[in-house]
Amino acid sequence: MAYVNGTTNGHANGNGLDLCMKKEDPLNWGVAAEALTGSHLDEVKRMVAEYRKPVVKLEGETLTISQVAAISARDDSGVKVELSEEARAGVKASSDWVMDSMNKGTDSYGVTTGFGATSHRRTKQGGALQKELIRFLNAGIFGSGAEAGNNTLPHSATRAAMLVRINTLLQGYSGIRFEILEAITKFLNHNITPCLPLRGTITASGDLVPLSYIAGLLTGRPNSKAVGPTGVTLSPEEAFKLAGVEGGFFELQPKEGLALVNGTAVGSGMASMVLFEANILAVLAEVMSAIFAEVMQGKPEFTDHLTHKLKHHPGQIEAAAIMEHILDGSAYVKAAQKLHEMDPLQKPKQDRYALRTSPQWLGPQIEVIRSSTKMIEREINSVNDNPLIDVSRNKAIHGGNFQGSPIGVSMDNTRLAIAAIGKLMFAQFSELVNDFYNNGLPSNLSGGRNPSLDYGFKGAEIAMASYCSELQFLANPVTNHVQSAEQHNQDVNSLGLISSRKTSEAVEILKLMSTTFLVGLCQAIDLRHLEENLKSTVKNTVSQVAKRVLTMGVNGELHPSRFCEKDLLRVVDREYIFAYIDDPCSATYPLMQKLRETLVEHALNNGDKERNLSTSIFQKIAAFEDELKALLPKEVETARAALESGNPAIPNRIKECRSYPLYKFVREELGTEYLTGEKVRSPGEEFEKVFTAMSKGEIIDPLLECLESWNGAPLPIC
């Protein structure tokens, strides 16, 4: 069912759709609900596909956050902005209306009046009024030298703001010439970015102060600056020449300055950038939670669809279904199932919450991020200045669409969701590096031969605590810190851009955490591979020694100790390999202790045969241990060396798993190393590779490849 809210842009509605096929939706709830149909993953895939298109065509009401992200982040990739010619007539009509009303003496806010709390003042000098508007709004502070960069809005956010502002003004309610929109478009397409102050807006009445610097460049204000495609600072004259904007600087006509500055484009533009990344990071968190379950030898029943169906929340159901898909058929899950069956009392009946309730934890965060995405998408397609020029009714409407509450609220909510994702990630990472919880992995994920000289991810765990603490602080809301502004005219204001900026910081921190966790998971995967090869070596060696020493007596007769082998191998199966492998034959480590206990127990059960030296099991213990000490350390080192040279006896199970594309990307494409204290390379050097790739969006394809065979539904309940 399609919905129609009964509004048009004040000009001809040429969509030609049969109204019989539409359901009236005057309050827009139907459209909002319909936008949330389908899976979150499918929406992310659409966003990625749209992000990669070479052209963004602006029509006024069809802009997406992925298009904003594309223009903001890909200023050197040739992505171009095009304006719909169909919008020209409507834009011109509103501009002409302003000039006509001015000539007729009509009294309109910002055209013949002062601004804000001083709107009781009047003037007939419409152009001079717009010039003064831009002058007094140029109140930002940049600093000088290195300080200037710290106080300048990131160029990516400025590009986003330019795109969103053009889109709003294209709808023909703002009273501005089409030529000005074309000029801003040329700046975008030639990678020329005005310098905007980082701070100074409360996003009501729009983002007045930062947007005034775009207007300042257009009008050639001497304090205006821009940055060119090579990073060189440009004067307004140089910017116009490089962009090919002809006719000189613009002399603003009545209402045009107000049209440029009185909108929410900076806050919503940055919010669009933030949400594009947040949606992808949410999917990454789902997949990494599944990988966490794999390397932790978790029980996959936590993803069973019935559990989540009975809870009803769509975000939770989808998160569980995605994890279920990754774990379905996983070689790690199959191996873990055998371990659980062999000794069900070796670990708790249920996995800890960071694993078992990860769908319940992530689901609401995904719903919040998705809802915020739609809210911002509505905002970037809205007309959000004042007054609005309604040509069809021949009037200017004075209202408050400049109030950026959708931005402030959605960004506060998104930041809280990001912090929750980070909290889960920290809990999972803390389990992963702790040998008390991680089901046999070494402490700190240390990969070397000598744990006394290898502390693995200990520094990374400290860094993760720092990241998580800062992220939780950022989760505090911005919107409850409103101050009454502009002589108490702007007595409530959204703080939209401030909240967007803080959410951008939160996304950066979540990327740091995601990077660290992903490299840690890859280390754990390699350690499980090493564990499997070493355990096989130990079992084979114990079996060989048992057969040689325990099978025959001194005269070649079968010895009672031959029945010990099965129990000795069970010891190897049950003992965590990394609890002893650095010195496998040490009497203080569990392997030799448990092997000896097993032999002693058999000896105690041997009865009177122990009195006979030829049939005594106890007499065999020393020979067994001596033989094992002579052979096992060499075999262990041989197995390690074979794996390090790329010739392990047992291949890495990850290649049989749906999570393999992410591992392959991190290890092969980015060339990260298995970390040990024996090597020079630090964890941070490997993290840098992954973080850089993540920031460039290079992780998207391997992430989506993990899920390319998912049909968008949970496995059937059977």
UniProtKB/Swiss-Prot annotation:
Pfam families, per database record? Lyase_aromatic (PF00221)
Q: How is it modified after translation?
A: Contains an active site 4-methylidene-imidazol-5-one (MIO), which is formed autocatalytically by cyclization and dehydration of residues Ala-Ser-Gly.
Identify which residues the record assigns to the active site. Answer: Y109
Major location (coarse) = cytoplasm
Task: List all membrane-crossing ranges.
Answer: none
Assigned EC number: 4.3.1.24
Answer yes or no on keyword Lyase. yes
Q: Which part of the chain holds the cross-link 5-imidazolinone (Ala-Gly)? A: A204-G206
Give a Gene Ontology cellular component term annotated to this protein: protein-containing complex
Q: Which InterPro entries does the record associate with it? A: Aromatic_Lyase (IPR001106), Fumarase/histidase_N (IPR024083), L-Aspartase-like (IPR008948), Phe/His_NH3-lyase_AS (IPR022313), Phe_NH3-lyase (IPR005922), Phe_NH3-lyase_shielding_dom_sf (IPR023144)
| SUPFAM superfamilies the UniProt entry points to | L-aspartase-like
What's its top-level EC category?
lyase
- Which amino acid positions bind (E)-cinnamate, per UniProt? N262, Q350, R356, N386, K458, E486, N489
**UniProt-listed GO biological process terms:** cinnamic acid biosynthetic process; L-phenylalanine catabolic process
Q: Which residues carry this modification: 2,3-didehydroalanine (Ser)?
A: S205
Listed A to Z, the keywords are: Cytoplasm, Lyase, Phenylalanine catabolism, Phenylpropanoid metabolism
Q: In which pathway does it act?
A: Phenylpropanoid metabolism; trans-cinnamate biosynthesis; trans-cinnamate from L-phenylalanine: step 1/1
Task: Tell me the compartments it is located in.
Answer: Cytoplasm
Q: Which reaction does it catalyse?
A: L-phenylalanine = (E)-cinnamate + NH4(+)
The UniProt subunit note reads as follows: Homotetramer.
Function as written in the Swiss-Prot or TrEMBL entry? This is a key enzyme of plant metabolism catalyzing the first reaction in the biosynthesis from L-phenylalanine of a wide variety of natural products based on the phenylpropane skeleton.
Similarity-based family:
Belongs to the PAL/histidase family.
Q: What is this protein called?
A: Phenylalanine ammonia-lyase 3
Organism of origin: Petroselinum crispum (Parsley)
Lineage, uppermost ranks: Eukaryota, Viridiplantae, Streptophyta, Embryophyta, Tracheophyta
The encoding gene: PAL3
